[in-house]
């Protein structure tokens, strides 16, 4: 997954001064190993602070992924129709959807000059799959033979018993055949396996990433050596530095990027970033604050971007460890029916969002218009009846948590007003400065109330809107949802001979979510971005990633 900050899962004058100081003036340093030397001011791109340091297997939110997309490329990329196309991979083949052979193109290099070879993929995947490393992308390795031995199950979940020790430190299903070939054995047939291989968790890492103890080094997390069109200009100190600086990697096999340097500017407030964009102190935003969308088209003209997005916005609940209202399926349904999605999308978002009626986005196969039915239909009377009959009035105030660095205040306040008016509930919006804090608290089972969440596809498949978020062992399962029938439907979809043949099974899993509502689908995203007069040829892909390789100075 890709959980989002704004459409990306993202304060005062002092912060503004820091942001402007970080992006204004100064020269990008010369860098060894094929990096460009520039005295021009870098192009400045808005992001939120990444949740973790910059390691592919531990990056599961879009701000970190935005940076990694500049630094790395994967086995596959995706065309305009969201179909996988080979990038580093020469071929990805299987006779049975279980045993896969991946052959690589020759000539790709890491930024330190070492070759991108089969071992670099196997080493990276093994490290991400090792449960001891607690990487966010661990779950995506779960279909490979040997994963279970590296990730033994805790017998009592959150109880006092501990999981047994792992019996392996590498995936037995990965085998290096030669420098440019490796094989992958899956536990079960999965026709969608090639489609997922463009996700960040599957990027390769060089030998330089690992220290003598076999661990990814702290230095690598601050200054990752990638294989993409840009390379790090200097190390990034998370929690300290207000920007992440990259420069062009001149020896990139696919040619040179048009830009010589990019600074990813870290903001804790979209409104501040937007003011910087208006003032010319920022060059690209891939998502604008809600309050700016209505006027941005007129202000920026052909420098305004509006297009369909793969994102879905939700209200989520920790259904096992949260407050009483979070644990009640009837209360969750009542809350959903009390939300006036149409008015929120038309008014708060100036018509640039669409009311959500499914967990699966309309941009991928498997979406069904109206699938959510009554639960996503605005009906204040029925919502109030259900809320009262389920004892909602006795369950205390409903907290609505959201990240203040993502431009969510307006729509969360609108939802809160819906619930106060239609349910008679006491509702407390709970802004948190950084989205990473919410994710960390959810992961630690500390968050008790409802929370704002969003998802942008990692790869174009209906499965990606279901399994990575709601499967019991998924690293992005912040709700705690656990349903055996759901898992069986997912398994059936994965095992189908083709993605198309698996859609019905994925939809059956979707139906279970629509009944239980661990999350409430609220709206489907559109991309609403803009860029300054300093740049041109700015495009944003369906994954909410800026296509930096082709951006040019104006």
Annotate each language-model stretch with its function.
Residues 354-390, 404-410:
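Structural transition elements
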Residues 186-256, 261:
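Gly/Pro-rich hinge or "lid" segments in bacterial periplasmic/extracellular proteins
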Residues 165, 175, 333, 345, ...:
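Extracytoplasmic/peripheral linker and loop segments enriched in polar/acidic and small residues
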Residues 218, 224, 248-295:
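Ligand-site clamp/hinge motif
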Residues 46-96, 225:
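N-terminal lobe/hinge region of extracytoplasmic solute-binding protein
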Residues 136-209:
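Surface-exposed binding/hinge segments that line
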Residues 365, 388-457, 499:
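Ligand/substrate-recognition segments at binding pockets and active sites
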Residues 529-554:
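Long beta-strand-rich cores associated with HINT superfamily self-processing modules
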């Amino acid at each position: 997954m890709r959980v989002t900050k704004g459409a990306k899962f993202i304060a005062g004058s002092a912060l503004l001064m820091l942001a402007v100081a970080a992006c204004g003036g100064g020269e990008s340093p010369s860098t060894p190993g094929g990096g460009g030397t520039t005295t021009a001011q870098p192009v400045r791109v808005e992001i939120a602070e990444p949740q973790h340091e910059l390691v592919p297997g531990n990056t599961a939110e879009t701000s970190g992924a935005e940076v990694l997309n500049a630094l790395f490329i994967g086995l596959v990329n995706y065309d305009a129709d969201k179909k996988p196309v080979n990038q580093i991979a020469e071929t990805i083949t299987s006779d049975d959807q279980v045993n896969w052979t991946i052959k690589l193109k020759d000539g790709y290099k890491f930024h330190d000059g070492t070759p991108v070879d089969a071992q670099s993929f196997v080493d990276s995947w093994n490290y991400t799959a090792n449960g001891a490393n607690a990487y966010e992308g661990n779950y995506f390795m779960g279909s490979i033979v040997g994963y279970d031995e590296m990730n033994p199950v805790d017998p009592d979940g959150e109880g006092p018993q501990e999981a047994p020790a792992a019996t392996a430190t590498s995936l037995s299903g990965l085998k290096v055949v030669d420098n440019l070939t490796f094989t992958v054995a899956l536990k079960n047939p999965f026709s969608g396996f090639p489609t997922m291989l463009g996700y960040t968790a599957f990027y390769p890492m060089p030998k330089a990433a690992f220290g003598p103890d076999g661990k990814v080094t702290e230095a690598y997390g601050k200054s990752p050596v990638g294989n993409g069109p840009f390379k790090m200009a200097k190390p990034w100190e998370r929690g300290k530095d207000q920007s992440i600086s990259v420069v062009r990697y001149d020896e990139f096999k696919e040619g040179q990027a048009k830009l010589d340097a990019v600074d990813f500017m870290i903001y804790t407030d979209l409104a501040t970033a937007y003011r910087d964009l208006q003032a010319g102190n920022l060059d690209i935003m891939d998502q604008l604050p809600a309050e700016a969308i209505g006027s941005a088209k007129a202000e920026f003209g052909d420098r305004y971007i509006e297009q369909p997005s793969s994102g879905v916005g939700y209200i989520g609940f920790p259904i096992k460890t949260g407050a009483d209202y979070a644990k009640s399926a009837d209360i969750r349904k009542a809350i959903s029916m009390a939300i006036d999605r149409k008015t929120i999308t038309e008014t708060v978002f100036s018509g640039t969002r669409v009311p959500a009626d499914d967990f699966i986005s309309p941009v991928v196969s498997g979406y069904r218009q109206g699938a959510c039915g009554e639960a996503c239909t605005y009906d204040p009377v029925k919502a109030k009846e259900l809320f009262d009959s389920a004892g909602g009035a006795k369950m205390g105030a409903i907290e609505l948590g959201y990240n203040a660095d993502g431009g969510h205040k307006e729509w969360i306040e609108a939802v809160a007003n819906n619930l106060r008016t239609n349910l008679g509930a006491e509702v407390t919006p709970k802004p948190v400065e950084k989205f990473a804090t919410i994710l960390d608290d959810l992961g630690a089972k500390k968050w008790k109330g409802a929370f704002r969440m969003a998802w942008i596809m990692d790869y174009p498949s209906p499965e990606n809107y279901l399994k990575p978020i709601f499967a019991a062992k998924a690293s992005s399962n912040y709700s705690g949802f656990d349903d055996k029938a759901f898992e069986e439907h997912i398994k059936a979809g994965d095992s189908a001979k083709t993605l198309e043949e698996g859609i019905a099974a994925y939809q059956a899993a979707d139906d279970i979510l629509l009944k239980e509502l661990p999350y409430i689908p609220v709206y489907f995203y559109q991309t609403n971005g803009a860029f300054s007069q300093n740049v041109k040829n700015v495009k944003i892909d369906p994954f909410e990633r800026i296509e930096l390789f082709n951006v040019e100075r104006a």
